[in-house]
C-alpha cells in the first residue's frame, strides 16, 4: 500500500541548549516535547559548508529549501562568487565589463545597488568592495552607490562601521559617491508592497523627501528617530548632481545574489511582465546586470547558479504521487520555486495553495501569522494527496523582529498547530517528517538582552511520526533521499547523499 506523507518545514527553528534568549526553549511546547521524547529524531546541519555556504555562515531559507529538495549540497550565490574572487575570475567577468564599457562610452555614471552588510544571506559587502576596485581599475570615471540597510541578517543597528570603511575606500576615487540610502524594508520587499518599493526606487532616481550630505550623519539622524537599518527612510545625497542619479541608458549592477527580494525593485527599473505594477517615474536601460539570475527578470546575469535537474518533487511526481505544496505568502516561493531547484516546475498531479500573509508593519504584533489558516487548509484538503510539502513561517519571521516574547508566542502557536496535524495524520493514516531550513527563533536575544534578528548556525530537527524506524544525524541534503527511501522510491543518481533511516544489519 502506498504510504502518504507530509513534510513539514518549519522556517527558522533551530536547536540550542542554552535557554537565555531562546524563543523555542522558553516556550511551552507540550507537542514538541512529546515528539522528541517518544518519536525518532535526529540533528540536521543547516549552515555553513554543510549547505554550500562559507564556513560559519548562517543558513537561510533559500539555501535551506534548495538543499532539502536537491539531495546534494547546492553551492549558491555567495560560495560561487567567493570562489570567483579567490580564483580571480571575478575580475574577468564579461557582464561587469560590459556595464563598465557602457559607462565609459556614454559618460553616464555606473549605478551599483544592493544590500550593504556582511550578512551573506542576500549579498555581501566584500562583493561591493571588489566591484568598486574592478570598476576603478577598468577606467570607470563616475560611480554611484545605492545602499540598502540590512539590520535583519546582521544586528539591527550595525551599518555605521561598514559605511566608515566604505568612505575610506571612496576617498581614493574622485567621483565615486554614496548616492542614496534606504532600508531593505523599502527596496527589498517581496510581498508586492509596491508603495514601499516605489519609495526605494524613487531614491535611485534622486527623488526622496529625506536628504543628506554625510551618510553617517543621516544614519545618526535615523537612529535618533528610533529607526534601525532595516527601516531607513529612503534618502538622497545632495552632493550628487541631479543628472547623475539613475536615468535613461545608465548601466546598473544589482549586487544582491539572492533573487527573491531583488525581483520587485528590478521589475520597476526594467518594467518587466513579472508584475502588473508600473513605476510612476519610468526609466529605460538595456544594461542591467544582476549578480545571479532573478527568476522572471530578463537581464544580464553575472554568475550562473548550480542546476538541480531532478529535485524531490519531480521524482515524487514521476512516481505517480499526487502532491500538494502549502505555505503562506512569505514562504510560498520556498516550498515551490526553491525546493524544486530554483526553477518554476510544472509537475503532473501537483497542486499549490497559497495562504495570504498578513500585511502588517511588524509580525511581532501578530505572531500567529497565518499558521492557523495553513493548518486549517491542510486538515480540509490534505487527505486528497499522497505527498505534501508545507511550511510554517512564523518562527522565522517573528524571530527576525528580535522580540523574544513575540517569538515565544509564535512557537507556542506553532506547537498547537503541530498537535492538530499529529491528530489529523493519525486519523487519516498519514505519516510525517518535521524539519527546519535554518535556525533563528532559538536565539532572539543576545547575552546582554539585546534583540538578535538574524539567522543562526545551530542545527535543526528531523522528527518522524513512524516509531518503527530509527534516524541518524545528517544535513539538509539528506532529507530528500530519506523521504524517497521512506516512500520506497529510488533516489536519482544526482543525489549523492544517503537516507538517514538506519537499516537493520
Swiss-Prot record:
GO terms for molecular function: manganese ion binding; phosphoglycerate mutase activity. Its cofactor is Mn(2+). Catalyzes the interconversion of 2-phosphoglycerate and 3-phosphoglycerate. Mn(2+) 1 binds at residues 396, 400, 455. NCBIfam families: pgm_bpd_ind. Coiled coil: none annotated. Belongs to the BPG-independent phosphoglycerate mutase family. Pathway: Carbohydrate degradation; glycolysis; pyruvate from D-glyceraldehyde 3-phosphate: step 3/5. The active site is at 61 (phosphoserine intermediate). GO terms for cellular component: cytosol. It catalyses: (2R)-2-phosphoglycerate = (2R)-3-phosphoglycerate. Binds 2 manganese ions per subunit. Keywords: Glycolysis, Isomerase, Manganese, Metal-binding. The gene is gpmI. Mn(2+) 2 binds at residues 11, 61, 437-438. This is 2,3-bisphosphoglycerate-independent phosphoglycerate mutase. Gene3D superfamilies: Alkaline Phosphatase, subunit A (3.40.720.10), BPG-independent phosphoglycerate mutase, domain B (3.40.1450.10). It comes from the Bacteria. Substrate binds at residues 122, 152-153, 184, 190, 258-261, 331. Its EC number is 5.4.2.12.
Amino acid at each position: 500500500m502506498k504510504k502518504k506523507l507530509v513534510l513539514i518545514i518549519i522556517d527558522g527553528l533551530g536547536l540550542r541548549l542554552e535557554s537565555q534568549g531562546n524563543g523555542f526553549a522558553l516556550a511551552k511546547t507540550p507537542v514538541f516535547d512529546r515528539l522528541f521524547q517518544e518519536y525518532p529524531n535526529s540533528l540536521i546541519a543547516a549552515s555553513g559548508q554543510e549547505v554550500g555556504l562559507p564556513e560559519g555562515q548562517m543558513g537561510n531559507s533559500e539555501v535551506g529549501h534548495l538543499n532539502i529538495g536537491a539531495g546534494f549540497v547546492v553551492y549558491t550565490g555567495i560560495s560561487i562568487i567567493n570562489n570567483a574572487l579567490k580564483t580571480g575570475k571575478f575580475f574577468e567577468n564579461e557582464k561587469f565589463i560590459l556595464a563598465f564599457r557602457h559607462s565609459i562610452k556614454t559618460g553616464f555614471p555606473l549605478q551599483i545597488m544592493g544590500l550593504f552588510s556582511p550578512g551573506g544571506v542576500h549579498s555581501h559587502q566584500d562583493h561591493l568592495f571588489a566591484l568598486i576596485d574592478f570598476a576603478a581599475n577598468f577606467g570607470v570615471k563616475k560611480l554611484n552607490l545605492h545602499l540598502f540597510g540590512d539590520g535583519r541578517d546582521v544586528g539591527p543597528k550595525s551599518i555605521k562601521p561598514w559605511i566608515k570603511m566604505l568612505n575610506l575606500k571612496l576617498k581614493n576615487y574622485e567621483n565615486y559617491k554614496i548616492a542614496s540610502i534606504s532600508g531593505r524594508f523599502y527596496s527589498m520587499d517581496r510581498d508586492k508592497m509596491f508603495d514601499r518599493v516605489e519609495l526605494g526606487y524613487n531614491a535611485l532616481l534622486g527623488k526622496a523627501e529625506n536628504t543628506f550630505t554625510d551618510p553617517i550623519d543621516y544614519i545618526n539622524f535615523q537612529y535618533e528617530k528610533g529607526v534601525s537599518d532595516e527601516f531607513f527612510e529612503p534618502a538622497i545625497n545632495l552632493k550628487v548632481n541631479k543628472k547623475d542619479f539613475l536615468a535613461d541608458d545608465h548601466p546598473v549592477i544589482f549586487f544582491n545574489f539572492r533573487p527573491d527580494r531583488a525581483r520587485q525593485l528590478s521589475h520597476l527599473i526594467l518594467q518587466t511582465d513579472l508584475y502588473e505594477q508600473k513605476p510612476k517615474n519610468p526609466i529605460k536601460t538595456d544594461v542591467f546586470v544582476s549578480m545571479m539570475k532573478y527568476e522572471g527578470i530578463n537581464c544580464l546575469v553575472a554568475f550562473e547558479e548550480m542546476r538541480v535537474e531532478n529535485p524531490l518533487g519531480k521524482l515524487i511526481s514521476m512516481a505517480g504521487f499526487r502532491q500538494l505544496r502549502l505555505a503562506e505568502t512569505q514562504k510560498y516561493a520556498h516550498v515551490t520555486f526553491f525546493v524544486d531547484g530554483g526553477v518554476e516546475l510544472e509537475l503532473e498531479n501537483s497542486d499549490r495553495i497559497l495562504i495570504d500573509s498578513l500585511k502588517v508593519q511588524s509580525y511581532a504584533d501578530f505572531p500567529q501569522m497565518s499558521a492557523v489558516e495553513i493548518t486549517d487548509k491542510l486538515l480540509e484538503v490534505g487527505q486528497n494527496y499522497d505527498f505534501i510539502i508545507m511550511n510554517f513561517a512564523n518562527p522565522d519571521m517573528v524571530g527576525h523582529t528580535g522580540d523574544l516574547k513575540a517569538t515565544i508566542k509564535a512557537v507556542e502557536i506553532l506547537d498547537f498547530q503541530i498537535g492538530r496535524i499529529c491528530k489529523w495524520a493519525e486519523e487519516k493514516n498519514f505519516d510525517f517528517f518535521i524539519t527546519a531550513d535554518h535556525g533563528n527563533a532559538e536565539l532572539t536575544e543576545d547575552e546582554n538582552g539585546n534583540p538578535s534578528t538574524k539567522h543562526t548556525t545551530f542545527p535543526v530537527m528531523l522528527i518522524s511520526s513512524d516509531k518503527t524506524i530509527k534516524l541518524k544525524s545528517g544535513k539538509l541534503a539528506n532529507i530528500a533521499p530519506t523521504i524517497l527511501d521512506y516512500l520506497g522510491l529510488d533516489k536519482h543518481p544526482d543525489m549523492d547523499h544517503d537516507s538517514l533511516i538506519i537499516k537493520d544489519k
